[in-house]
Amino acid sequence: GFIHLTTAAFHYFKAHGGGHIAVISSIAGTKGLGSAPAYSATKRFQNTYIEALEQLARMQHYPIRFTDIRPGFVATDLLKGGRYPMLMQAPKVAARIVRAIDRRQTVAVIDGRYRVLVFFWRLIPRWLWKRMPVRNR
């Protein structure tokens, strides 16, 4: 799904003189999350795939822009009834996504609280991270 759609968009924009590919991944791609290993690995793959396509477009001089949108927890039916930290309302998230695309941001971590969280997550060494009881509920 993700690879086919993103690659199709890349080839379409390559053939038509440029464009902007925006994908929604997640902050879960920042670190391996023991509470959701497959999910965090998939999101990390998406981050890396977009980064690689962006580099390819630049090397080949294709005028294709990319925005990797990385929200945290968004209040949707999928999360209904659960207790999730820093839950964001969907309309607010949608407005921030539109703003990130309009500003041509390469990576957009949605919401300042999550930007701070991601910043600190990246500072945690692997030996310590694997000992932390990170939960998503």
Please identify what each model-predicted range represents:
Residues 6, 42:
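Active-site helix of classical SDR
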Residues 8-17:
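A short helix-coil junction within the Rossmann-fold of NAD(P)-dependent oxidoreductases
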Residues 14-15, 57-62, 74:
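A short hydrophobic alpha-helix cap/turn motif
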Residues 26:
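Residue(s) in the substrate-gating loop at a strand-loop-helix junction
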Residues 31, 52-64:
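Active-site-adjacent segment of SDR/Rossmann-fold oxidoreductases
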Residues 31-37, 82:
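Active-site loop immediately N-terminal to the catalytic Tyr-X3-Lys motif
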Residues 65-71, 75:
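Conserved SDR Rossmann-fold cofactor-binding beta-strand/turn motif
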Residues 68, 80-118:
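C-terminal helical subdomain
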